[in-house]
UniProtKB/Swiss-Prot annotation:
Name assigned to this protein: Pseudouridine-5'-phosphate glycosidase
Cofactor mode of binding and number, as noted: Binds 1 Mn(2+) ion per subunit.
Family matches, as PANTHER family: CARBOHYDRATE KINASE PFKB DOMAIN-CONTAINING PROTEIN (PTHR42909:SF1), ZGC:136858 (PTHR42909)
Protein family per UniProt: Belongs to the pseudouridine-5'-phosphate glycosidase family.
InterPro entries: Indigdn_synthA-like, PsuG
Complex and partners: Homotrimer.
Name of the gene this protein is made from: psuG
Segments passing through the bilayer: none
Cited function: Catalyzes the reversible cleavage of pseudouridine 5'-phosphate (PsiMP) to ribose 5-phosphate and uracil. Functions biologically in the cleavage direction, as part of a pseudouridine degradation pathway.
Region forming the signal peptide: none
Organism: Anaeromyxobacter dehalogenans (strain 2CP-1 / ATCC BAA-258)
Active site (catalytic residues): 25 (proton donor), 165 (nucleophile)
Length: 310
């Protein structure tokens, strides 16, 4: 049986030397953004990590192998809609490998693989969480909760994001993170970012002002206190869209999704694309900017964490 996880040589060497490495998810390439924005986002994120002094490690399933440090050819495979790449959460990895499939990795899958590989910092756009109820949907129905939350509770990885995706129930997601014991740190903010928008109205108890402060928290959490949960580092988006504009677009998109019977893994990309159309591309521009910003911050944190361990 071939090894299910393959590390690119640059990633392997950096980890062996105790150097800074940042994992990057690839569902944004396979499903999250349309061409050519998907590849642009991946390349900008990798460049931002390198500019911060760390090694980027895009995680993907390529021809049945979990690759840590996917190269440009692999990313181009995932970016091609004609190849119909799957969307891999953590639970899907074994089955997709067995079937020899290609897949972009979600936050849950990327965090799981990063932890397995020994990578402690991971950059993404926004995490999944508790989905909103569509208008008219009964509250007593089964809640749609992303596996990202459960994986954050068991993978000791710092996930750098612009908070939960704006299409979610942010208050319920924040409560779930608290229940699961996942610390949430605001990056120079005391308010949970709302992905496209810099404020959600949800206060954060803890904030850090720089990468060194974040690294100290991570070391204490994992090493001194022996905690196993991940840590969410929430970074406000650099090109924020007014919250009321985003909320109006989400409300309309939720009704449309319900009318079309769109559920499960298809909901998030559908809603994100609908919000982008409704905001005349402003949301997509904000998405690209925050992805790059998060990758840069993650690179800084990885460098500080590696220096702290030296």
């Amino acid at each position: 049986m071939n090894p299910p996880v393959r590390l690119a040589e640059e990633v392997r060497a950096a980890l062996a030397a105790g150097g800074p490495v940042v994992a990057l998810e690839t569902s944004v390439v396979a499903q999250g953004l349309p061409p050519p924005h998907n590849l642009e986002a991946a390349r900008r994120c990798a460049a931002a990590v390198r500019a911060a002094g760390a090694v980027p490690a895009a995680v993907a399933v390529v021809a049945g192998a979990v690759v840590v440090g996917a190269d440009d050819a692999a990313l181009e495979r995932l970016a091609d809609p004609a190849r119909r790449p799957a969307k891999a959460s953590a639970r899907d990895l074994a089955a997709l490998c067995a079937a020899g499939r290609d897949a972009g990795t979600t936050v849950a899958a990327t965090a799981a693989v990063a932890a397995l590989a020994g990578i402690r910092v991971f950059a993404t756009g926004g995490i999944g969480g508790v989905h909103r109820l569509a208008p008219g949907e009964p509250a007593a129905g089964a809640a749609d909760v992303s596996a990202d939350l459960a994986e954050l509770a068991r993978a000791p990885v710092c996930v750098v994001s612009a908070g939960p995706k704006a299409i979610l129930d942010l208050a319920a997601t924040a409560e779930a993170l608290e229940t699961l014991g996942v610390p949430v740190l605001g990056w120079r903010t005391s308010e949970l970012p709302a992905f496209y928008s810099d404020g959600s109205g949800i206060a954060l108890e803890h904030r850090v002002e720089d990468a060194a402060a974040a690294a100290r928290v991570l070391r204490l959490h994992w090493d001194a206190l022996g905690r196993r949960e991940g840590v969410l580092l929430a970074v406000p988006p650099p090109e924020a869209v007014p919250r009321e504009v985003v909320e109006a677009a989400i409300a309309a998109a939720l009704e449309d999704a319900r009318g079309r019977g769109i559920r499960g893994k298809a909901v998030t990309p559908f809603l994100l694309e609908a919000v982008s159309r409704a905001t005349r591309g402003r949301a997509r521009t904000a998405n690209l900017a925050l992805l790059e910003r998060n990758a840069s911050v993650a690179g800084e944190v990885a460098v500080a964490l590696a220096a702290d361990a030296a």
